[in-house]
Amino acid sequence: MLFRSEMYKKDENGKDMVDADGNPVFLQFKDIVNYFEEGDTFIFNDTKVFPARLYGTKEKTDAKIEVFLLRELNAEMRLWDVLVEPARKIRIGNKLFFDDVNEMVAEVIDNTTSRGRTLRFLYDEDGNHDVFKRSLFALGEAPLPRYIIDAREDHHATEDDMDDFQCVFADKEGAVTAPATGLHFSRELDRKSTRLNSSHSSVS
């Protein structure tokens, strides 16, 4: 498993490998720096995970629902591409509530796939998009893999998960899951790769 808890050691994940001569060898991820030389290039996916999982209720019935934010479609209109659960009960025209004071409300305006929906958030704080995003993300949780959420007694992420489920070089917001290989890079390993006099490039 790539990620279990805050006790997870990012760079100590190990794998049984076979060397060039066909001999079995056990390596930890942090050993990767031993295979790079001066002049080599590290390419990092610097996409930053945002708190994409929201929990709320459906209008009238107060049924519990889950919304997984995928991407913002239109900032001015507050449109988001999302996945929903339970999909069969969330239809066009339904309103979804995400807080106790009904400030963060979304209306379903389109079905995109069996679980996919387009939501329009009915939130207006003087038209300030940054305030809206901060308020929306404050209600969200770290988008941990489902097998981790299901294994927890309360089925929720913690505040610490947002840091643990993030690559140390993450910079540009937009990911709903951390790049798997990048999760293994610890800050110490990042420093070691820099000391190799290798070049670093990023993609988002």
Task: Describe these PLM feature segments.
Residues F3-S198:
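A cross-family signal for N-terminal binding/gating loops and helix N-caps
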